UniProtKB/Swiss-Prot annotation:
Involved in the high-affinity maltose membrane transport system. Initial receptor for the active transport of and chemotaxis toward maltooligosaccharides. It comes from Photorhabdus luminescens. Belongs to the bacterial solute-binding protein 1 family. SUPFAM superfamilies: Periplasmic binding protein-like II (SSF53850). Residues 1-30 form the signal peptide. One of its GO terms (cellular component) is periplasmic space. It is found in: Periplasm. This is Maltose-binding periplasmic protein.
Length: 73
């Protein structure tokens, strides 16, 4: 009987984890656009170097790359 209870608790925990993941990731998924790559980085964390890598990637693949450091994050 103990195993059945553990299984139910595990299933409930998994379901809640999946639901929380979907809710929290919905805002991140809302900005996805075909053929465009947006990279968010803090302005003090190598922004310029990453922007240069993005330019090379864009030149090599044709995928538009935007490197941003949003103030509201």
């Amino acid at each position: 009987m103990m195993t059945k209870t553990n299984l139910k608790m595990g299933a409930r925990t998994l379901a809640l984890s999946v639901l929380a993941t979907l809710v929290l990731s919905a805002s991140a998924l809302a900005k996805i656009e075909e053929g465009k790559l947006v990279i968010w980085i803090n302005g003090d964390k190598g922004y310029n170097g990453l922007a240069q890598v993005g330019e090379k990637f864009e030149k090599d693949t044709g995928v538009n790359v935007t490197v941003e450091h949003p103030d509201k994050l």
